[in-house]
Design a protein with these regions (language model features):
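Charge-rich, intrinsically disordered N-terminal extensions
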Residues: 1-126
Length: 126
């Protein structure tokens, strides 16, 4: 992973960690109206970190692009074998990837067209 990609990954992970702590606090106070499990809040940070880590996902000679990472992460065979995974958790992963795309767009790494294509790919898993 290049230094720039490592930096982007760290920015995402810091953002996810802050959001997850805030959401977990809301959940514990009983203010969350949704029926989502506490486990989903606790696991999304770890899972998205894993999804963005090319070395832990694929044995490829080249660094996989975002589309390859998304397809691999959400692939039915893989997703069904992730410990504690459930289909209702999927919106957390999608939200996390969307945040990552916003970071990339803000940094000028992707344009609006690429962002739309990535969102379209994510929406195919809903």
């Amino acid at each position: 992973m290049t230094e720039k990609e490592e930096y982007r990954r760290e920015v995402l992970l810091i953002s996810l960690e802050k959001d997850n702590k805030r959401l977990l606090e809301i959940y514990r106070r009983g203010e969350e109206k949704d029926t989502l499990s506490q486990r989903a809040y606790e696991n999304v940070y770890e899972r998205v970190s894993y999804a963005l880590s090319s070395s832990s996902l694929m044995n490829l000679e080249k660094l996989p692009d975002l589309e390859e990472r998304i397809i691999f992460f959400f692939d039915e065979d893989y997703y069904d074998n992730v410990p504690s995974s459930s289909k209702r958790d999927i919106r957390y992963y999608i939200t996390a990837f969307k945040r990552f795309f916003l970071i990339l767009k803000r940094e000028g790494e992707i344009d609006e067209e690429r962002e739309r294509e990535l969102y379209s790919l994510l929406s195919s898993y809903l």
